[in-house]
Structures are given as C-alpha cells and as structure tokens.
Amino acid sequence: MKTTAKLSFMMFVEWFIWGAWFVSLWLWLSKSGFSAGEIGWSYACTAIAAILSPILVGSITDRFFSAQKVLAVLMFAGALLMYFAAQQTTFAGFFPLLLAYSLTYMPTIALTNSIAFANVPDVERDFPRIRVMGTIGWIASGLACGFLPQMLGYADISPTNIPLLITAGSSALLGVFAFFLPDTPPKSTGKMDIKVMLGLDALILLRDKNFLVFFFCSFLFAMPLAFYYIFANGYLTEVGMKNATGWMTLGQFSEIFFMLALPFFTKRFGIKKVLLLGLVTAAIRYGFFIYGSADEYFTYALLFLGILLHGVSYDFYYVTAYIYVDKKAPVHMRTAAQGLITLCCQGFGSLLGYRLGGVMMEKMFAYPEPVNGLTFNWSGMWTFGAVMIAIIAVLFMIFFRESDNEITAIKVDDRDIALTQGEVK
C-alpha cells in the first residue's frame, strides 16, 4: 500500500472512531436514565482531555518514541476503556471510563496530523487530500450507526451501546494498522524534565507575535464555534426543519469539497486570507441562522446555506491552522505544537464555549413560556455568536501581519531550549 493510501486510511479510521460514539451518545445516555447534567459532563470529557493530554503526549513523542508506535498504544488502550465504558449503567461507573478513554483519544488528533505532515512532500498540497478522508470517515460512522442498520432491516442502534462497541473495535483496528504506517521517529534529543513533559517548551512559540495573535484568535473562535455543535440540531428542529440530523450532514459534504479545494485557495490567496475567510463565513453562517425559518422558501434556504457554510468555515480556519502550525514550529517540537493548538481549540476554547453557551441559553435566551412555538430566543443567541466572531475577525485582520513568504519556522536556539528546561537562571 502506498504511503498516501496508508495515511488516508489512518485519517478515515481516526475520525470514524470519534463520530461513531459522539453523535449518538446522548440518545443512549438519556434512554439509560442519565440526567441532562450528567450527559453534559459526559460530552465535556473530550474538552477536558484536550486540555490535559495532547501536549504531554506530543512532547514525549517529539523526544522518545516514534509517533506511529505511540498512536498504536493509545488506540489499544482506548479500545479497552471504551469497551468497559459501554458496559456501565451508572454515571459513577461511566464517567471515569469515558474521561480516561478521551485522554487516550484526544492526543491522537495531533499525532495523526504529525504523522501525515512528516510523510508528505508538500504539506499545503497533500495534507488536505489526506485530511478529507477524516471527514468521509465521520460521515461513514453516521451511516454505519444511523441509516445502515435500518436500511438492512435491523432496529435503530443509536439509542444503544453498540456505537460505543463499534468505537472500541475501530480503535483496535487502527492500533493494529498503526504498525504499518510510515516510521515517524522523534525529531528531538533534548533533555527531558517536568517542563518538557508538560509541553511547556512548545509555549516558547508564543513569543512570536504573529503566532501569538493566531493562537489567541483560535482560542476565542473555538468558543462561539461550539454553539453550532451544541445548539444547531435543536434550533433547526424547533424552527421546523424535518430530519435536521440528516440534513446537517450537508455540512460534512461541503467540508469534503472545500477541503479538496483548500490547496488552490492557500496558493492563490495565502494562509492569512484563507484563515480570515474561515472566520468571516462562520459569522455569515450565524447570520443566516438569525433570519432562517421553515415558514418561507427564502428563509428555509437560509437554514441550508448556514449548514453548508459549516464546511467552509471549518476547513478554511482549522485545517489551515494545522498547516500554519506545521510551518511555524521547529522540526523537533512539531508534535507538541500540534498538541498546543488542540489544547487551545478542542480544549480550553471548546470547554468555555460549551459552558458559556449553556449558561447564556438558560439565563438570557430561554423564554418563560413558548413564543410562536419557540422555547428559546434563537435569534439572540446566533446574533451574539455572529458579533463575537466578527470582532475576532477584525482583531485577526488588524494584528496578524505575516504574509505567506514570511511564514518560516520560529528559530529556537540552544539558550531557548535551556530556558524551557530550567537550565538558565
């Protein structure tokens, strides 16, 4: 099997694993008698894990172990943890296992990115073609756990623990396949101490002004972006869209198209403009949701346009962000740098977004009594999200000054390395 095919299959299974359990988890937990608060904490596991684990694993991988071997170990551990989590019937038994599983899974996002980056000749050209298989994997997991069983005449498996068992099996599969991936050895031989283990050496990248602006804007953007994942399905259903869950997959299909088109856009317009376009389209998407409804053809079309813009905003910002980080990070800390952006976005940013969105919907946008069939002031919520993203876009446009021909790896000399390891007082 050619290297590109191996990397594509790796990315397919990586995102199939997450999609298999994440989308339908609330159905099984609610049917099993878990409270709304317990379900919320269960979904927060990935954000908590993204804070605790990726940089640690990235720093160890950068120094000691080949990335594909670390991937294999994490996948095997995750398979066991998810299998046992699927057997639980109480929150006290389920939550610790799901959190432990998430701690094994979230670092693999950065690991698979690093393995792909290290084994393609042209990152800007080749990575989007490989990463698009992750989106296809996510869609495939939805089909496997949603439509396919019913099409074959079986009962719906979404409200059961079967999607979790599928996740466990898929994790074991990728664990085995990882040993057949291209060897991606550690790039650094520096001293290992507690600061390096915690990934604090990657924080030295923040001394670069443009990288700091990028990092800060990525963190802020993750908060309003989380509103889409939490509320879009409920909003679309409440305003009258039938089978909203199915129609929302249009966002993933548009993601495939724009992922494949990403090399053209980055070459033609440059990384800064593509990142900015990702922010702008996210704000426009929420703008469509402000005025969307199922009452008229035009307002109904706005709902679909908002869904389709998800692919544009996600690809143009976050996929481009991973490419930018790979360009900026020195070779010996690229995995840790990918972990840093995962920590920033899927970790702190998403967790704060989930909490902010939930509190605002409960305290500010919930109607005491239904108004025109709506239980929430959805327009107010989407307006807040759109304005927040627009402000982030303006900040990014003003303060991020790096052009494509200036994007080079941040120089880290021996003194910098000594500082991160506590050898210079």
Language-model segments: residues:
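Juxtamembrane intracellular "pre-TM" segments in multi-pass secondary transporters
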Residues: 1, 181-216, 416-422
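Multi-pass alpha-helical transporter architecture, strongest
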Residues: 85-86, 171-182, 347, 376-417, ...
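Loop-to-transmembrane helix entry
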Residues: 34-45, 125-133, 158-165, 237-256, ...
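A membrane-interface helix-boundary motif in multi-pass transporters
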Residues: 147-169, 359-389
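Helix-loop boundary and gating motifs at the non-cytosolic
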Residues: 1-47, 210-249, 318
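Structural signature of the two symmetry-related core transmembrane helices
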Residues: 69-83, 273-288
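Hydrophobic core of transmembrane alpha-helices in multi-pass small-molecule transporters
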Residues: 12, 81-82, 91-111, 115, ...
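Helix-to-loop junctions at the C-terminal end of transmembrane segments
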Residues: 52-66, 149-153, 258-271, 361
